[in-house]
Amino acid sequence: MKKFVNIYTVLYLLVGILGTLVTVWFTPITVGPITIPPSSWLMGFSFLLITLIQDAYGSKVSERMIWILLAVTALICVLLNYTLMLVLASGIAFVVGQFTTKTLYTFGTSRTASSMVGSVVDVGIWVFLGLSPIGVGTVPWERFFQAVLGQVLVQLILQGIAGKVYDKYFK
């Protein structure tokens, strides 16, 4: 297997780690009828990055990167004494969302579309298990749908922009 440490894999790890940390460091922002969890600004990019890693190094390396990032973020959560539910929520949402993106992309769905679908799956699981009263409680039940909508909107907008920039300048 060829060496796979490059800008995409490093960014993938950084985005995932920072996305996990900002969840506890900052509270969600409410803008009108929607609530935007802090991880919204970062985690959407991990879905685009995993497709770039798959293009550059193949399916096995992209799978390995998903598991590496899961292990690193779980370790960080445990070391920082985050609640076990936050660790589990993060892990479950991340793995299901990333593998959804990877699988759709493998079967021919566009980079942007597969990333967006994976993000929606990730967000639903993450907000439900991690941010709601089941998890750390930063999103009360009455704001649940607004938080999912807020995170999905931010991630989809950012992914759409990033996908267009990538297609225009890096393809």
Label every model-predicted segment.
Residues 1-56, 60:
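Hydrophobic transmembrane alpha-helices
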Residues 7-9, 60-70, 110-113:
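Cytoplasmic-side transmembrane-helix entry/capping segments in multi-pass membrane proteins
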Residues 16, 69-73, 119:
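Residue-level recognition of pore/gate-forming positions within transmembrane alpha-helices
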Residues 17, 21, 51-52, 74, ...:
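Alpha-helical transmembrane segments of multipass membrane proteins
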Residues 23, 27, 32-36, 73-93:
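Interfacial aromatic-anchored transmembrane helix boundaries in multi-pass membrane proteins
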Residues 47, 65, 150:
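Pore-lining transmembrane helices
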Residues 83-171:
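Membrane-embedded alpha-helical hairpins and interfacial helices in multi-pass inner-membrane proteins
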